[in-house]
UniProtKB/Swiss-Prot annotation:
GO terms for biological process: thiamine biosynthetic process. It comes from the Archaea. This is Uncharacterized protein MJ0640. The lineage of its organism: Archaea, Methanobacteriati, Methanobacteriota, Methanomada group, Methanococci. It holds the Pfam family AIRS. NCBIfam families: methan_mark_2. It comes from Methanocaldococcus jannaschii (strain ATCC 43067 / DSM 2661 / JAL-1 / JCM 10045 / NBRC 100440).
Amino acid sequence: MNLKKVVNEIRNFEGILRKIAIKDVVETFDFNDEDYEFDIIVDFGDDAAVIGIDGDNAILLAADGIWGKLLEADPWWAGYCSVLVNCKDIAAMGGKCVGMTNIISIKDKDICREVLKGVKDGVKKFGVPMVGGHTHPDAMCNVLDVSITGIAKKDCILRSDNAKIGDKIIFAYDLVGQIYKSFPLNWDTTTMKSKKLVRAQMDALVQIAENKLANSCKDISNPGAIGTLGMLLEVSRKGGVVDITKIPKPEEIDLIHWLKVYPGSGYVLTAKEENFKEIKDIFEDVEMTAEICGEVIAEKKLYITDGENKEVVFDFEKEFICGC
């Protein structure tokens, strides 16, 4: 395997490069100098913000803007995915989804109609209501943004920034699916599945969180498998070594392409090795595949290996993905 080629493909992948702009946004805000009524437990750099509302409970807040390329390629799928990605963000934190709001900007009414059909179908599939929002009826372009609220116990949150040295790196996927016909970077595992299974897959993360089996977790999103892991390690101020040949993948898909894919249901976690069997069993109960693929290290670099050779993908002492 040509690891240098893999590294080059990952480092130049648009799904990762688009995250660099986050740093400028983060540096604008400073919560340390403000006096807020509620406890901001987690803010930028995670799948959702976490705000404590009393001694035991927290609300989770997340938002996603749908990639313009996706909306142009397939408006229905863009609408459906706006629900999917938000629900997965809450699930990755070990939370339960409560409700969503949206902002939709309309230039083309036919496209808008398809987007809204997709949103409606997503709501039916994932069982999370769309309860309000804002509409721009005279916009210069078509844009869809969705926000979501979730709930969780304060002591049962799966954070991105809590990876520990020596943790095993675990990738978990639903491998039963298909590349989405009009957007090859998406692996669809939900449209053909029952509501019961799709929702159970999200609840699996709640079970892992409440049993305190993992130290950190992140939903695999637009940066792909390695990019998402890189973001987790960056905010944890750690590094890692990952054997990319051990990452679960469908046999028919090229490895480099798979490392860039946004899966319908996929997560990267770090956990003590002794907890892996229980984590694996929880995922298997909802028809997902989980494997140990690497280890968290103190050196702030992310390496990939094929079992023989090793290459640096990111050096967090010198560079960043999101700057959080």
